[in-house]
Amino acid sequence: MIFRIACFLFGATLLAQTNPLWHEQKIKNYLPHMTWPEVQELLTRSDMVIIPVASIEEHGPQTPIGTDYLSGVERAKLIAQKTDVLVAPIILPGLSPYHMEFPGTITISHDTLQRVYFESAQSLIHHGFRRILFLNSHAGNQFLTSYVADRINQETAAIAVELGASMRGAARTSTFDRHAGVAETSGAMYLFPNLVDLSKAGKNDLTLPEHLNKALPQVVAGDAVATQVFLAEALKPKETGKHTSTREMSATGVWSERDTRESTAEQGRAATESFVNAAVAFIEKWKTLRPLAPLADRQAK
């Protein structure tokens, strides 16, 4: 009897010895957590897949290098809890050459990224997904996702769109606030709070070329021409000689005139819920415009 009890306790101890770092719960419709039969079952109900794409790049001293990627994936997960759609993250890094002066940033070439995006979408199309929604959380990727979406539309049986295109428009402020600023920090505080260190936040001094600095008020005011030419020149690799790499314009990597100590989880919650609700409305509207085809007609023979 004692031997049996000892064996039972030893077996229970072995079962309890699992990875102490793993705290993730299984998320509905999140591809990395699913089995293939679960994906097959989802395909009978939906032909839609969100592909979050973003970056691995510096985000100042207060928010993590994975801010863009985590923001995109977490928002996509929230969307998938409200409407039947698969979430399929495919790659963490993006196009970030202008951040390379900050340690930890990873950048991938245009050609490599567009091939990975397109070929990953092709795999999902092969399985029967016919509506591809790119959720891009990094401005540097925007022209790539536009190109790949158009290529999917031109070369495959699927239809691809950029999910954020019809729901952009963060609240306009009277002060310049972009990369790693109050808006992004607030979003991080809501979506992944344990990775934000607000004690390292503060007021940032921008060191833009004089003509770009003079254009800032027009950019903040929403002038279309000023914004277009400003962004065409700003945030470019140091090697271009434009003096607009992130490090050349900001010693901390924060591209904002606001004090990031103003960031709050409540601001992040409001912005996130607004985006998620708009995305869900977009998806539900698309479902009414294009009925779901039978799975047998969608899967490769």
Feature-to-residue mapping (PLM):
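Extended, histidine- and acidic-residue-enriched regions that form the cofactor-binding/catalytic faces
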Residues: 17-85, 89-97, 103-108, 115-131, ...
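Sec-dependent signal peptide recognition
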Residues: 1-8
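Hydrophobic h-region of N-terminal signal peptides that target proteins for export
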Residues: 8-16
